């Protein structure tokens, strides 16, 4: 519960065991309507591509902040730019865009109240070493019949 926020979460597969007194499951329409900040943390699937589009933005509070450190195509960039310019969306921050590296004609460039950074968390030597260590640990565990970091969709 960061900064005293009430946390709403949505997933296409509801997992009640992840709900706590500080985090409650909400359907997307409720999440859009109730949130001051929307932060995307999900893989990209055909079903959620463009989930933040004009229609979704219209359901959001005026001045909402949108964060995307997941996948660029989750957001329709033209619709977000329009909402930023009009003030419907108060601000956005992201380290992913629909086409990387970002092109000069990306509609988000030059938009109001947006922070764009490169998606390079993996770049430092320490991060790459950690990735290799995790890969080795995963392989060893798999070979021992005890897989870790299993993701079930």
Model features per residue range: what roles?
Residues 12-107:
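Rossmann-like adenosine-cofactor binding region
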Residues 1-8:
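Conserved anion/nucleotide-ligand pocket segment
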Residues 2, 34, 138-142:
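Short alpha-helical functional segments enriched in proximate histidine and acidic residues
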Residues 98-153:
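C-terminal helix-to-coil terminal segments
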Residues 3, 21, 110-112:
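Short, structured coil segments at secondary-structure junctions
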């Amino acid at each position: 519960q960061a900064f005293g926020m009430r946390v709403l979460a949505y997933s296409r597969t509801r997992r009640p065991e992840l709900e706590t007194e500080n985090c409650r499951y909400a359907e997307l329409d409720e999440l859009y309507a109730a949130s001051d900040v929307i932060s995307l943390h999900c893989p990209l699937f055909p079903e959620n591509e463009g989930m933040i589009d004009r229609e979704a933005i219209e359901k959001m509070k005026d001045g909402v902040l949108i964060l995307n450190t997941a996948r660029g195509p989750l957001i329709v960039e033209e619709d977000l730019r329009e909402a930023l310019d009009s003030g419907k969306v108060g601000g956005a921050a992201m380290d992913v865009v629909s086409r990387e590296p970002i092109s000069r004609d990306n509609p988000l460039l030059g938009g109001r109240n947006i922070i764009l950074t490169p998606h390079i968390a993996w770049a430092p030597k320490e991060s790459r070493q950690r990735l290799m260590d995790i890969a080795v640990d995963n392989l060893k565990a798999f070979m021992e019949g005890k897989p870790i970091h299993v993701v079930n969709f």
